[in-house]
């Protein structure tokens, strides 16, 4: 075999020997949007910014990711475990604890298998970004100079 025929045989053999999807295996097997693992030497706050950017790419919000990050900085210092002094507000975007069960139900999907806790950074962020995408930042209207 010469030339193009030989090249075709090599390409076909290579594709049959490499399992489908092996080169593009995800870093995580968690379902749903923005299932990002922390990378080496990444702080929690850096990871939260990545999750916010990821969610905003999927559900655009007024002011984009920069505004969302600004609001999260003011609300919690980008700390997923932040709880207000009286315990009324929780997580990255400081959702009202009393409103959290309804917000979780309304703004997540069961197939995503998100953690139900408001103190989960990914879940808290996805709920906030979806709310802001649909309704604007009204729930966070009084937040700083963002």
Task: Please provide the spans of the model-predicted regions.
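Substrate-binding/active-site groove segments that recognize
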Residues: 86-109
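Stable alpha-helical elements in mature extracytoplasmic
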Residues: 47-51, 64-68, 121-131, 136
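Surface-exposed patches in mature extracellular/periplasmic domains of secreted proteins
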Residues: 58-69, 80-85, 137-146
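Export/targeting segments at the very N-terminus of extracytoplasmic proteins
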Residues: 16-17, 24-78
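Secretory targeting and sorting signals
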Residues: 1-27
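A short, structured beta-strand-centered segment in the mid-to-C-terminal lobe
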Residues: 110-123
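Catalytic cores of secreted/periplasmic lytic hydrolases that degrade extracellular macromolecules
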Residues: 27-30, 39, 133-146
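Sec-exported extracytoplasmic/periplasmic mature domains
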Residues: 56-60, 73-77, 97-101, 129-137
């Amino acid at each position: 075999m010469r030339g193009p025929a030989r090249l075709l045989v090599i390409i076909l053999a290579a594709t049959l020997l490499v399992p489908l999807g092996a080169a593009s295996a995800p870093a995580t097997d968690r379902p749903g949007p923005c299932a990002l693992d922390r990378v080496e030497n990444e702080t929690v706050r850096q990871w939260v910014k990545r999750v916010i950017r990821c969610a905003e790419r999927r559900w655009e919000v007024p002011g984009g990711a920069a505004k969302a990050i600004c609001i999260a900085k003011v609300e919690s210092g980008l700390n997923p475990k932040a709880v207000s002094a009286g315990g009324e507000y929780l997580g990255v975007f400081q959702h009202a604890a009393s409103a959290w069960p309804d917000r979780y139900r309304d703004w997540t999907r069961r197939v995503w298998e998100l953690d139900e806790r408001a103190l989960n950074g990914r879940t808290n962020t996805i709920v906030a970004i979806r709310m802001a995408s649909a309704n604007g930042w009204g729930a966070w209207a009084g937040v700083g100079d963002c």
